[in-house]
Amino acid sequence: MSEEKKQWSISDIEAIYQQPFNDLLYQAHAIHRTYHDPNSLQFATLLSIKTGACPEDCGYCSQSGHYKTHVEKEKLMSVEEVLQCAKEAKEGGAKRFCMGAAWRCPPDKAIPQLKEMIEGVKSLGLETCMTLGMLTKEQASHLKEAGLDYYNHNIDTSPSYYDKVVTTRKFSDRLDTLNNVRSAGINVCCGGILGLGETREDRIEFLLTLANMETPPESVPINRLIPVEGTPLAQAERVEGIELVRTIATARILMPKSAIRLTAGRTEMSDELQALCYFAGANSVFIGDKLLTEDNPQRFKDKTLFNKLGLTEMV
């Protein structure tokens, strides 16, 4: 008999999120130990396979065509180029290879090339993930046919705050794509960004949305905004570290089986803050020098920290 899924309320999550910090960490870490090896991390690598000139106006994004940033437009990479990057990622220790393209939605004519990329990366023994914008049911089915393991499509923030960050699409559009991905039988990677000007209440509503999905995301990336010059959020106030840890700990409690990925913003985090994030339940990171267009901690720096903490690669 299957276990009935709990439907969380705002008051439930407020009580978890806002409890004394030590109690929150204790509860999150106990759950983390129950469902995961607390001393192992999943390593993934993220590659931008088509960069810039995105028609969406996400206020945080360096790749939006609405803003003048440091990012230069680049066409879709060839299958050969992508596979070479995937080989290098595998040699660097990655187990999952994520491919991102700056589109509102992928053009149908690109689907055969994307399928070749998926098949080629899988042939190297890597898990595959893509983030290409919104997908139709048919497109999701094509990617599944090629063997795509995960599709990333973040909800970014709470439903209440969403239109303060993006105006070229609706929050419901995100949910529609997530439903198409799930219906195709592809695992879901879905999270958001802290530091968009949202309140704590927005973070709680964001977590509620994820946790109350019929099937919560298998992977939940938690990003700390990297402010980009030229975007509307270039001067956004950084979310303090304790708030980041509270968000990760609450996500771990609400979604105990999911991988919680500590993603963008690690370059600006101290070793101590990262250690707290891992203790709170984060058990996945991107390795490599770049996250799409922004810097990521260099491999040797990560290796040094993980050795200090006794964290090893997830088998």
From Swiss-Prot:
Residues 39-266 form the Radical SAM core domain. SUPFAM superfamilies: Radical SAM enzymes. It comes from the Bacteria. Its cofactor is [4Fe-4S] cluster; [2Fe-2S] cluster. CDD domains: Radical_SAM (cd01335). Pfam families: BATS, Radical_SAM. [4Fe-4S] cluster binds at C54, C58, C61. GO terms for biological process: biotin biosynthetic process. InterPro entries: Aldolase_TIM (IPR013785), BATS_dom (IPR010722), Biotin_synth/BioAB (IPR002684), Biotin_synthase (IPR024177), Elp3/MiaA/NifB-like_rSAM (IPR006638), rSAM (IPR007197). Its EC number is 2.8.1.6. Keywords: 2Fe-2S, 4Fe-4S, Biotin biosynthesis, Iron, Iron-sulfur, Metal-binding, S-adenosyl-L-methionine, Transferase. It is an enzyme of class 2 (transferase). It catalyses: (4R,5S)-dethiobiotin + (sulfur carrier)-SH + 2 reduced [2Fe-2S]-[ferredoxin] + 2 S-adenosyl-L-methionine = (sulfur carrier)-H + biotin + 2 5'-deoxyadenosine + 2 L-methionine + 2 oxidized [2Fe-2S]-[ferredoxin]. Disulfide bonds: none annotated. GO terms for molecular function: 2 iron, 2 sulfur cluster binding; 4 iron, 4 sulfur cluster binding; biotin synthase activity; iron ion binding. The keyword Acetylation does not apply. Catalyzes the conversion of dethiobiotin (DTB) to biotin by the insertion of a sulfur atom into dethiobiotin via a radical-based mechanism. Homodimer. Belongs to the radical SAM superfamily. Biotin synthase family. This is Biotin synthase. The gene is bioB.
